[in-house]
Amino acid sequence: MGITHELDIFVTNEDLALKNIELFKGNSYGCFINLKVKEEKRFNMIFVLRPDWSEIDSVKPIRMTVNNNHVDVEKVSESIHEVVYSASFLISFNSLVKVFSDDPDKYKNVYPTVTINVPKKKFKVVDQGNTYMFIQYPIDDCDKERFLKDEFKYCDNEYDQYNDCDE
């Protein structure tokens, strides 16, 4: 059958989700993100990896570069269902972000490529690679509540009893 992990990336300060960035099959995950900016900007990203444990004992860590410079990716939490990572970086010109578990140059034909034009608020999947990836804007409320509680304050306590995001 083959391994099929699930990976979502949340670009929190743009309220944008890159969903289903996993390969159709295989023990590798990653993507290329072209960021277009007009001025200095900080980006905060949350990575949610849902491993397929059927044929592996541990997950490969997520690594990241911006314009070929290493960016620290911190593991925030880990459970049997998912591993959550975060990263933050600052850019002042158009940049290429590589998110990967394995050598990105080896997988450049299968990892997806996305362009995020921040000033114009335009987002595009340039190449899906071997994935079913899509862009979600804005990030849906269930994902915000599960993974981004500290990033977004969007819910009044009065309405918490009606929250349908709980599993």
Curated annotation (Swiss-Prot):
Q: Name one GO biological process term.
A: viral process
Q: What role does it play?
A: Plays a role for multiplication of the virus in different cell types.
Pfam families in UniProt: Pox_C7_F8A
The protein depicted here goes by the name Probable host range protein 2
Describe the family membership recorded for this protein in Swiss-Prot or TrEMBL.
Belongs to the poxviridae C7 protein family.
Name the InterPro entries on file: Poxvirus_C7/F8A
Write the lineage as a comma-separated list: Viruses, Varidnaviria, Bamfordvirae, Nucleocytoviricota, Pokkesviricetes
